[in-house]
Amino acid sequence: MDDQLKHMTGQVAKGTMTRREFVGRAAALGVTAAVANSMLANHAQAAAHEAPIRGGTLKIGSSGGESTNTLDPALTASEVPLNNLRHLYESLVEVDPNGEIENRMAESYEASADAKTWAFKIRKGIQFHNGKEMTPEDVLKTMQRHSDENSQSGALGIMRGIENMKVDGDNFIVELGVGNADLPYLLADYHLMIQPDGGMDNPGAGIGTGPYTLEVDEPGVRHGFKRNENYWDADNRGHTDYNEVLVLNDATARTAALQSGQVNMINRVDPKVAALLDRAPNLTVKSVAGRGHYVFIAHVDTAPFDNNDLRLALKYAINREEMVDKILRGYGTIGNDMPINASYPLFDESIPQREHSIEKAKEHYAASGHDGSPIILRVADGAFPGAVDAASLFQESAKAAGIPLEIKREPNDGYWSEVWNKQPFCASYWGGRPVQDQMYSTAYLSTADWNDTRWKRPEFDEMLLSARAELDEAKRKETYSKMGQMIRDEGWLILPMFNDFVDGVANNVGGWVEDPNAELSNNKAGIKCWVKDA
């Protein structure tokens, strides 16, 4: 039995068996769920504590890169820029794979009893890449820049909840109008990377405190990073001499690059080839469930999308189970037109699942009074793997309901700068956030810069603020439930599926840690992993 369990834990690590399957099969062998989960945790911990090897070059093949990309953390919106941020910069705190807060530029933090005032003690002796020592003033200026209404920062919605910020000795102080026990999670947002003088003068310079310094910056092509020899946490990050991120937006090209040894790891393995790729010699497919979701979004302030009956018609028309089966190939779960799933704390499982119903789609489409002109949906596989095929499935099911959905395929390059958040109806992707407050504050608060559906409801904003201040978890959960149902029934988010994060990794890579926060081990694989044959 021991050999069988050992083999099964290895399958979970490779992503060929889910945790649920492991627990079920272990139960058949007489192992309790508690013991089974402990075995998985011990296996992951042992892998994570493998002795690092210093030196060598690590190459990452990643989708989500464009010629318009910048190194300004405020403007980061896709995977390649996010990977770059992890190499160059660090935030006050981070969220670890277990969902706990990990201190980075902050050495410690504490809050007042009402969670309105927070003090983050800033580490001493940490240098930026330009030799300047990081100070609490750099932290303050960074946060002030992201609070500027003209910053276009993806964290602007988060920062609007802050009334005042200041420096007090070694501490960065945050004062809130409404208490928020989740504030550290909000400040872990990847846009809030600490820069010298807050990045006020040159936010795209690439100068941070991270484990690597910038060597090559060719947006849309490649980015190169050299190990920072003065890095403060060298025992845990920055093991390789050099890292390179290659922009490979085409899924077939990414897979070929991994198979040929051109790169050591890739993100967003096409689910159609995942099982086949995992059988290839010297390669492993890593899969972890999380909060990422593939979506179709429209602007509620633009006709004909300002009609809720039309919105509901399309929501009932889409066949979620078909998409999970055919697009995700089982690497995910069905969605419910709200960005929250069971991976989130305080999720309400009693919210009814919206079912595929052609009859209801027809009823709502007729009630919408739409004139029958083509409804244009813009897509590219750069939005998410299989987006074009998913749109085709959507088009067919909409056709069955008499809805004239027309697909317009856009180029991958420029999709995130020219289509997303600009065109009124398109495919999109969200990686999710650690807590509900952050997800809602980033994309659904009326004043959020990344409110990509333009859905604005004062009553929703009020509920978000009241949930922040609510210390009774049952009441907080009830408020979050109402908010989720508002988006589900009134918003312009069509969320057919939550995706697993599916990555491909060469077996000569060590230090991989399963992280449900985002793909490529929360985009930290490049800074935490090493090359075994360096």
Can you annotate each of these PLM segments?
Residues 334-367, 384-389:
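Structural transition elements
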